[in-house]
């Protein structure tokens, strides 16, 4: 049930070796759902469905190097890393050095059986629409969120200008209400209008100073 309602599952417990039962249960769950492990937009290894990694690769929009085409084509046809190492007389450490950058860039993922698979990007889609829909899905369950939190959640593939444009779009279509401050928090917050209580009691701030060095300073130019 948890996997059916989660887009990404980060393997925190098993990576730290603190919960053997969680490790066993996770192995059986990812096998049952045929999940793959790869790098998300924040650089964390996560379990997710193949289609999700296709979306992430589209958002990254990073071209492959010509010298990487041979290994990517190999893992389009088969998923056996041992066969690749045998054909190329390659040690396991050499193989890891070869595939690690491709895993970080999202071009390769690993399946639940230990094999590798090349990620083919989504075709005939508008990149901006994909990014916008990804950000919408990212923030839709947060009743209150700051711009800096959105920036950290989105990852390095999103420029501050893109986040700013999406936040403006969310205001226009009613997904979020405009920035406000909450007690004990110094950052500007955005919130879901339908999830916030006591909207009528929110008071206007007297003054607000945004440092010029803030990467999202341009957002506030129109406010």
Where are the model-predicted features located?
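Long, low-complexity intrinsically disordered regions
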Residues: 1-223
